[in-house]
Amino acid sequence: MAFEIWVDADSVPKGLRTIILRAASRLALTCTFVADRSLPDVVQYIADDTFACRQKAREHGMTDPEQIRAVKSRIHMTVVQQGQDSADDFIVASAPAGSLCITHDIPLAARLLEKGCNVMDDRGSDYTAGDIRARLGDRLVNRELRSWGVFAEQQGSMDASGRKAFADNLDRKLTKLGKTI
């Protein structure tokens, strides 16, 4: 089975989605963004990428209009019905083992690791079988503190260094998994 990227698009900031879109397009990887609503930036990128793919097909001598119309981007936007964990459930059911999955959602990451997927978060860090229990525990502690009115420190907004860390880790992951940017 071909290598795929799966993105929990509800939890990944727009700037990082752009990095993922460009990498998937450049490497001609199948990449599926899953959310409970359509994301205009992803939809527009898919349209632009489809146009570029068709242009390349024409440049390589394809002339039949039906064949050209059949050429499409390998990037997809899947909109699931709204509901708790509906996007998560879809990703777990659909992503094959060995896929690269990108999410900020720790319980989803645990489910994907159990399935045999490679998982990274939106800050450029890998989720591993060795640290997922600790991350789940930290999440529960923070939730309990919030319920008591004690607010745990939140992550700041994504800055240029954060985007670079994410892009660098994506590059490393794709290289390790047999793809290069």
Which functions belong to the PLM regions below?
Residues 2-181:
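Nuclease catalytic cores that cleave nucleic-acid phosphodiester bonds
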